[in-house]
Amino acid sequence: MVTSWYKIWYHTTQVIFILLFVGFSVVVPLDCIVQASDSSNDAVNTFIVVGAAVVLVVFGISISFARVLIFRRSLQDIPKKYIPVTAQDMRHKPSREYVIENMKRAGELAEKFKVPKEPVLHAGMEPKDSDMFPEHLKYAEIVKFISDRFRFDGALLLNFVTESDLSTTFKTALHKLFENEKHPYKQYLDEFISLYEKFRFSGQDIERNDFVKFLRLYKYLADLSNNLDLTRIESVPSQFLHVPTEDYDTDARSRTDSEFSTPYLRPYPSDAFMHNTTPASHVGSRSSNFSYDIDESAEPPESVEDQQRYHDMLTRVDTYNTVIHR
């Protein structure tokens, strides 16, 4: 109650003083004009009238500038870290609430923009300084590599089958491989296929947790497939390999240099190395009817230096004895 009466008294006296000031400011020039009109000296009369008007204008400008200077000096006395958050600091309540709301938002942003203590996990790519995968590894490229190995090489998990035609999908081949298996294997297989199709066809970035789960299921099913009987897999000649799978030996380290007759798992083999294909039942030993449709007599003779240079270049390819057995 006291505060409200104080405000009323303060505003009332302020209005009275302003009216008195404006009244005196208007009356003084008029009084000078009236008194000068009674005088017979026109020069003195003109000086008095103009002087009164000039004094009034200068006085008003001086008061305005003085108010601005005093206001700025008062602002300089306020500490830079001072924020008006109380009713005594800022009378306008909406403005005070706006300041407080922005202070809270600034605090939340400051916590988010701090340097993270742990690596930031972005979907689709491995973070820097990772202890699980190579840094900046793109998860989608790994999934695509698994798909391409099946499509072009007939590689299904850790086995090599002949069902690598375009008509056979990765999902169909897996169901064929585990068709006689029961739960809980089928549950893990369905989960693995679901993740694979999500990664390949959803168009979304792969989350790190889903990718780790995908690799664990891949390893589990790959280990399980080693104990399966691959003879029950139906034989279908591949359009891309141009060679039966029995011509590939899974134990490449047991081969001698002369036994390596074709590049290892190439997506598009050269036309010069195409040969007659015969249906094969499963991965096994070398076929006895393996032959090349190439006339080696047409090849120019190579010098010893050229052979040694080619040998050195090929042995640098470190992909599990792909070309030359060392």
Swiss-Prot record:
Domain of life, per lineage: Eukaryota
Protein name per Swiss-Prot or TrEMBL: Defect at low temperature protein 1
Membrane topology: Multi-pass membrane protein
Gene Ontology annotations for the cellular component aspect, listed alphabetically: membrane
Compositionally biased intervals (Polar residues): 276-291
Main subcellular localisation: membrane
Ranges of compositional bias, category Acidic residues: 293-305
Task performed by this protein: Required for growth under high-pressure and low-temperature conditions.
